[in-house]
Amino acid sequence: LRSRTNLSLIKLQSNERAHLIMKEIGVRHSSIHQLLYCPLIDAHGLIPYGFNRNQALMEAMFTGTDYLIFVDSDVRPEVLRKTPDGAVQSEEIDFIGAHLHGLSLGADVTSSDYSGYNILPPASFDGMKDLLWGLHKESMADFWQNSEAHRGLVIQEDQNAEPQPTTKVLGGNLGIRMSALTTLPPFFSPYYFYNRTPLLARGEDTLVGMAASQSHIRCLDIQTPIFHDTYGDYPKVPDLRNDSRVRDRLYYACTGWIGRNVFFRWKTGHTPSEFTQRNRQLAAGAKALARYTNDRRFLYLPDIQSAAESWLPDMIGQYQKSKEAWNELTERWFGR
């Protein structure tokens, strides 16, 4: 890449440079504080997903980058495919090139899916469908209910497919035209508390997808899934019942989806009363999952949703402050 273009590696380190630059261009102190500091970091050692990705966006902005491509620590430029004899093997892909090709077609944002073990590990119990409906993940119901056959492994079937318009954006497989930041919303995912324990909502990339669905930006699926080592020990099959790490991952995925759902129900103009049936399904599915895993944490998912709903006013405040600060930064930076 360096032989063909100017390449910069954006690393998340200290924010001293960003603080100085924002101060120089006239961003208010309150906005700088909102963009660079999060109370969860010092108090609990947690960084909200959206906050982290915005740090990378700002560093790329201040570096003068034209295109930013996210490379998460748990992905590799490979895809899983089946051989003619049915075995699964990894195949190297031109991940960076695929994103740059999509951006060269005029896209503001390029994205695609993942290859590897899904966040839903292999399982088989009554209540799987209820749980996913309660978590607004019903599109995954057939996949999960058949997971004992495919072991939760996502394999790429199509080759050389052409990029297609999409509204689905995944932060770990993402390219951005930096000039689009004038119309692109910031990444955002709120946090909330349950029994004094902080929980991070997922869906930090959902606002970008919503902007694409409203035609504010052009987003392409580059048809290039990237290998995601979900549990950090591929090719070991995830064992939900006997591996506490797998249960932890699923538990925090559930609490993350709950936080996302509560916030985006509000963002899309819905009220909690519209989801009474889903709440019943969440309670039934959570009870079934707790029995299946012998892990009582899952029993509390309905209580955790109630806690998230009580935190909605605070989530809205987090969002409005983040959006206001981000808009001020981009207006100052691109209006120089």
What positions do the PLM features span?
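Conserved catalytic core of nucleotide-sugar-dependent glycosyltransferases
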Residues: E78-S189
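Terminal low-complexity segments of carbohydrate-biosynthetic enzymes
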Residues: T230, D239-R336
